[in-house]
Each structure stands twice: as C-alpha cells, then as structure tokens.
Amino acid sequence: MTYLFMILAFVTGLFVQYLIIVSIVLIHELGHFLMARLLGWRIEKLMLWFFGGVMVTDEHLSRPIYEEFLVVIAGPLQHVFIHIGLFYFGDLLLGEQLLTEAYQYNIWILLFNLIPIWPLDGGKCVQLGLTSLFPFKTAYQAMLIVSLCFIIGILIVGSLYMILTMSGIVLGIFLLQENIVEWKRRHYIFMRFLLNRSQSKQKSKKQIVEVEPSTSLYHVFTLFKRSSHYQLKIRQWDEAVIEENEALAFFFKGHTAQPTIRDMIYFKEMN
C-alpha cells in the first residue's frame, strides 16, 4: 500500500506532501520503537503504512499491561512534539501553504490512529482496557467485534454520504481485511496468551476460582484475566487447590485430547 500511495503522489504532483506524511508516520513509529527499547523489548522490524505502521515484536502478551500501554501511547504522544516543532521551526523548513498542510496532516493522522480499530493505537488501547477488566478470551473477541463494527460503519456511512475518498476506501478495505485475518487467528492468540502465562514469572494478585472436577481445563482458562494469577479450588474433592501453572503445564503436555480437572488430579495421584 505504501508503494501505491508513492506512485499516486508522483502522478498527482503531491510528492512533497507525501514526504511530509511519511515523516510524521515515521516519527510516530519511532515513538513506539524507542519506548519499547527503553523497556527492554525485543523488536524484529518496523513496517510503515500510509497512515501508520506496525512494530513487529513477540513481546505482546508477555509483558505487563502498563508496559504495553506506555509503548502504545508513545506513538500518539509524538504528535504533540511534532506540533511544537512545526510551531517553532516550520517557517524555516516549509512555506506557508505546506506548513498549514503539515499541521493538518499531523492532526488527522493522530485522530485516525486513535479510532478504536485494530491494529491502530486506539484499538490497542481498547484491547488493553478490556483485557485488564475482563477474561482475556472474551475481551479480545469483544475488541475485534468493536473494531469490525467501526470499520464497516465508517465504510457504509462514508460511501452513502460520499465523504470517503478512494484512498480512504482502499484503507478501510485494508483494515477490514486485517481484522478478518485477526478474527481467524483469535484461537491462536489465546493459545499464545496461555503459553506466555505458563512461562511467566510476573507477580500478580491472586484469585481463587471454584471449579467442578468435570470442568475442562480449556473452559477454566477462558476465565483468566491478564492481571491476575489463579488458584483452582476443586469442589467435591476435599477442597483441593491447584495453581494455574500446574494446570497450564498439564494442558500443554497433551496427556489427553480434552483434559479436565479430574484428569489432571488422577494423573497427579498416579505420579
């Protein structure tokens, strides 16, 4: 998509405007990158789009929520510094018309990135908020539903009232495709969330969940929130208590196809 907009910029004689937009997007992404590096994250690469970018890292879901929030918010924060830079130095670098356009691009890119659409910063903030309050699996799916509703709503309203440009429609379709792919990947994301928990040494507040022996481990895991560590209190079994790390380890070792709490207890007693 970046190459498409570059070609269009050449053809329409708007290459300087294109460079201004790319510069704003690059500074925005550098905000994410520098904050992530400051927090010691491993970063694979940065990918730029026309109205934003993606910092590819495997640290998501394995870091505390507050760290992810700092990394997310560091991008939009750069637009404040860009505005200050344009105010003090814009006259030296740009003419009056281009300076006005630079202000507008900076504001529009900021507002666009704050829309609650995945994988924009607004969507990521919604995801972090929901996953801090509700079980991860439920929250992640809810975030994607909200995101899809916003995209479809904007495309429908924008098309009916003819307020979307061709580039806006292309961008909307691109984001729609990204969200559909993410929806199809939601089970994989949940499994990655569980795997990270099984390896995590972070200290979280403890919560006790009462479960029946016949309850599947997978169902129990769907109750897990990111910000809590769980102990499973088993009804009708001398009130036995199992730590979540034990349950996750048993689940990932694949002793049975659909392990239950009872399966795990029998296995522990036999060993």
List each language-model region with its residue ranges.
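Small-residue-rich helix-interface/hinge motifs
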Residues: 11-68, 101-105, 109, 118-120
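Membrane-interfacial segments at transmembrane helix termini in multi-pass membrane proteins
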Residues: 166-203
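The conserved cystathionine-beta-synthase
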Residues: 209-229, 235-271
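Topogenic membrane-insertion module of multi-pass membrane proteins
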Residues: 1-16, 73-79
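Juxtamembrane/interfacial segments flanking transmembrane helices
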Residues: 42-46, 114-130, 187-189
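Transmembrane helix interruption/hinge and helix-loop junction motifs
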Residues: 10-19, 94-95, 159-166
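Hydrophobic core segments of alpha-helical transmembrane domains in multi-pass membrane proteins
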Residues: 5-6, 18-26, 102-106, 163-178
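Membrane interface segments of multi-pass transport proteins and intramembrane proteases
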Residues: 88-98, 128-143
